[in-house]
Amino acid sequence: MRQITKHNRAGKKKNRILLIACMLVLVFLMTGCGKNSDGVIRITNVSYDPTREFYEAYNPLFEKYYEDTYGKKVEVIQSHGGSGAQARSVVEGCNADVVTLALEHDITLIEQTGLIDKGWQKEFDKDSAPYTSTIVFLVRKGNPKNIRDWDDLIQKNVEVITPDPKSSGGACWNFLAALSYAKEHYADEAQQKEFMRKLYQQVSVMDSGARGSTTTFVENKKGDVLIAWENEAIASMKSYPGEYELINPSVSILAQPSVAIVDDNANDNGTQEVSRKYLSYLYTEKAQRLAAEYGYRPSDETILKEYGDTFDLNIRLYTIKDYGGWENAYKMYFDDGAMFDEIYDF
């Protein structure tokens, strides 16, 4: 039986909650002597769901680096949620200095309002993607449904957990990873579409974000397989040793979370310089190794190869360029009336 969680389709309510949270942060900054009046520079990083633990570790690393190097204290304030909803919260007034979101398209939505300068993709290395991931399966111990690849997910006795592409950037990557498999195995577009329809017919719970889907599968014990960020699957196995297994499909997609300075906010807050250093530091050796420890693939190829035991480097990975970039992909698959709406019966 399919279930779309109530908060998933109550998108406006979700956005209001995120906006209220961001406004509380803003009030704190204003009433708590602002960004600098107590001697502490504060910046806000609006990020997506599965990065919580990574940035909890990264922020103290950066704060120490900045104080040791420049003699000034920095405090990084975090906000997390579904990537699409997070982007909309910034558009609607959340006072983010930087965004670290699940996909380029979400940052482009902010750019289109003028809050982020054009050309942000080239401001940092690797198209402003300091770490990457891919999409894998998380199954229960012993893999009771014998899931090995995408075609196993369309079996009638398999319940699939994946978030909603309308609110979750990770869910968009999940969709494209599955479609990449379909493209490998079906030359005809109608057959590819039918495969996707069958897959999403097996989705029993669709949360608004990747972390919500992980909670549904791991903590609430619903479903047979979770379509997940690789880093989220790795984290789940560490948190619940012996209870879950990671299955690498034959075909997936190179998921590239993106980062950017919210230029208008950072300029108004006087944090442009700190914000730039905050994102630049993600590319340092220390930060790249930290990303790997938290299940993200370092953009530094040398460091990535050192973690060959953690990451399957032999998966056939499509890229967003294979879909004509995010603008084209959104138009074809995720906009109102596009493929996802056609195949998924709400």
Model-derived regions: residue spans:
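Bacterial N-terminal signal peptides that target proteins for export
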Residues: 4-20
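C-terminal motif of bacterial Sec signal peptides marking the signal peptidase cleavage site
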Residues: 29-32
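N-terminal segment of the mature folded domain
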Residues: 36-167, 314, 344-345
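Short beta-strand->loop
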Residues: 46-48, 139-141, 159-185, 199-203, ...
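Periplasmic-binding protein-like
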Residues: 129-134, 196-200, 207-208, 239-272, ...
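Short helix-loop capping/hinge motifs at secondary-structure junctions, enriched
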Residues: 142-148, 167, 180-188, 265-273
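Ligand-binding pocket segment of bilobal, Venus flytrap-like solute-binding proteins
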Residues: 185-250
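Extracellular/periplasmic juxtamembrane helices and adjacent flexible linkers that interface
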Residues: 266-346
